[in-house]
Curated annotation (Swiss-Prot):
InterPro entries reported for this sequence: Asn/Gln-tRNA_amidoTrfase_suB/E (IPR017959), Asn/Gln-tRNA_Trfase_suB/E_cat (IPR006075), Asn/Gln_amidotransferase (IPR018027), Asn/Gln_tRNA_amidoTrase-B-like (IPR003789), GatB (IPR004413), GatB_C_1 (IPR042114), GatB_Yqey_C_2 (IPR023168), Gln-tRNA_amidoTrfase_suB_CS (IPR017958)
MF (Gene Ontology): asparaginyl-tRNA synthase (glutamine-hydrolyzing) activity; ATP binding; glutaminyl-tRNA synthase (glutamine-hydrolyzing) activity
Entry protein name: Aspartyl/glutamyl-tRNA(Asn/Gln) amidotransferase subunit B
Gene field: gatB
Record-linked Pfam families: GatB_N, GatB_Yqey
Reaction equation(s) it catalyzes: L-glutamyl-tRNA(Gln) + L-glutamine + ATP + H2O = L-glutaminyl-tRNA(Gln) + L-glutamate + ADP + phosphate + H(+); L-aspartyl-tRNA(Asn) + L-glutamine + ATP + H2O = L-asparaginyl-tRNA(Asn) + L-glutamate + ADP + phosphate + 2 H(+)
EC number(s) recorded for this UniProt protein: 6.3.5.-
Keyword Nucleotide-binding part of the UniProt annotation: yes
Organism per entry: Bartonella bacilliformis (strain ATCC 35685 / KC583 / Herrer 020/F12,63)
Length: 499
């Protein structure tokens, strides 16, 4: 397949070699497992984690006379994905046989789509940053195509010293192969691309995105060249299943190719594997070309055809996607690009935030979700679906602050109590004496005492207004964080005769 490079050189991405600058060019073929109860051409289950060879039909095992039947839900999921990628949906596509031998491929061929894929060109917009000025840069990564294919089985080599085993549970599972254009110029962009693509798939509900289960695997194509020169010879790094590993593999492979070229060598078009333990790639074979697979239309499957009305009906049911939600958070709620970007990283986080933000100040809610909730989740290695602090509880904590019943500091203590113990918020505040002190007389007594004990700072305050904050902090400490901060600030300024 001929790839056309249209992105101009950018010195920010150049790699310095011993003989001058180089540019890395990256494309990606992402295999995303479709969310479906059954496989692409059989009724066997797709559930992960079953005992070996428990989810295998006669079709998956390639028994003679068994004919494939297309799973319509997999077709719908592929179209939904294409729409989410703003791609061309092809109303007619064809299944081909991709011929090669491997022990975990019982048919001796893989059913795929080569000449006429179900989805054509699209795009994914990634956001790089923030830079030193807090700015983000949007970069558009082109999608060449999306086609459907069936997964192979799994060869297992570590169960016996002299024998290998084959598990066909995965054989026939529906995959979407999403092929990007060679538009990425750094490992950072590649990681941002796979992160964004995974995010879109999860929002659409077409792939669960669980990389640790193999639901998303990436073949990363890497080449290097002098800036402005034609594309170099690419090497393909197969089946990288971690975003961090994708970045490490690209960094190593780019440096390896540069070293070979600067030493007077040539790059062979290879298929390589990434060794995570050694953080390096190694060759496994010379790269195959399309003609090596002898593609031809599968005679057991008719061309796949549907009309535009079918596509339009699916388009009308699409959920709101990350970029649209991010724009709404920024434009309607006044969030920063940074905060909005964090809140959309996972659909569950965005949903949680929106539940809490309903009828409340979006910026304040964002601050609590990002700093307190996500911080607690990371600290406790917990997913947001399992958080002990539910959206209505966090919303109630924020309401108590807004009503002046508790201070911001006490609110954080209350959050910790709910996280670890649960319980009724207002009852906890009442029983544990957490209510905010609003009695001006009591606060004034604390202010007077602190000023009496620190006459030197009182005398310096008019020249150093920043000391107001120190006095406020001392009063808050003296009252156990229960004093109303606004009242404290007002009284301190009045006592110090500072406007």
């Amino acid at each position: 397949m001929q790839m056309i490079d249209i992105r101009p050189p950018d010195p920010r991405h150049f790699i310095s070699g011993s003989t001058g600058d180089w540019e890395v060019v990256i494309g990606m073929e992402v295999h995303a497992q479709i969310v479906s109860d059954s496989k692409l051409f059989s009724g066997a289950s797709t559930k992960f984690g079953a005992e070996p060879n428990n989810h295998v039909s006669l079709i998956d095992a390639a028994m003679p006379g068994m004919l494939p039947v297309v799973n319509q839900e997999c077709i719908r999921q592929a179209i939904r994905t294409g729409l989410g990628l703003k791609a061309q949906i092809n109303l007619k596509s064809v299944f081909d046989r991709k011929n090669y031998f491997y022990p975990d491929l019982p048919q001796g061929y893989q059913i795929s789509q080569f000449h006429y894929p179900i989805v054509g060109e699209g795009k994914v917009t990634i956001s790089i940053g923030p830079d030193s000025n807090g700015q983000f840069e949007d970069v558009e990564i082109g999608i060449e195509r999306l086609h459907l294919e069936q997964d192979a089985g799994k060869s297992i080599h570590d169960q016996h010293p002299t024998m290998s085993f084959v598990d066909l549970n995965r054989s026939g599972v529906a995959l979407m192969e999403i092929v990007s254009k060679p538009d990425m110029r750094s490992s950072e962009e590649a990681k941002a691309y796979i992160t964004k693509l995974r995010m879109i798939l999860r929002y659409l509900g077409t792939c669960d995105g669980n990389m640790d289960e193999g639901s998303i695997r990436a073949d990363v194509n890497v080449s290097v060249r002098r800036p402005g020169e034609p594309l170099g010879t690419r090497c393909e790094i197969k089946n990288v299943n971690s975003i961090r590993f994708i970045g490490q593999a690209i960094e190593y492979e780019a440096r390896r190719q540069i070293a070979v070229l600067e030493d007077g060598g040539v790059i062979d078009p290879e298929t390589r594997l990434f060794d995570a333990a050694k953080c390096e790639t190694r060759s496994i074979r010379l790269k195959e070309e399309a003609h090596d697979y002898r593609y031809f239309p599968d005679p057991d499957l008719l061309p796949l055809e549907f009309d535009q009305a079918f596509v339009d009906a699916l388009a009308s049911e699409l959920p709101e996607l990350p970029d649209d939600i991010k724009a709404r958070f920024i434009n309607d709620m006044g969030l920063t690009v940074y905060d909005a970007s964090i809140l959309i990283t996972e659909k569950e986080i965005a949903d949680y935030f929106q539940k809490v933000a309903r009828g409340r100040d979006g910026k304040m809610v964002a601050n609590w979700v990002i700093n307190d909730l996500l911080g607690a989740l990371n600290k406790n290695n917990c997913k947001i679906e399992d958080t002990p602090v539910k959206p209505d509880q966090l919303g109630a904590i924020i309401d108590l602050i807004e009503e002046g019943i508790i201070s911001g500091k006490i609110a954080k203590d209350l959050f910790e109590i709910i996280w670890h113990e649960g319980g009724d918020l207002r009852q906890i505040v009442e029983e544990r004496g957490m209510k905010q002190v609003t009695d001006t007389g009591a606060i004034q007594s604390a202010v007077d005492e602190i000023m009496a004990n620190n006459p030197d700072k009182v005398s310096q305050a008019k020249e150093k207004p920043a000391l107001v904050g120190w006095f406020v902090g001392q009063v808050m400490k003296e009252t156990g964080g229960k004093a109303n901060p606004q009242t404290v600030n007002k009284l301190v300024k009045m006592k110090l005769e500072i406007d």
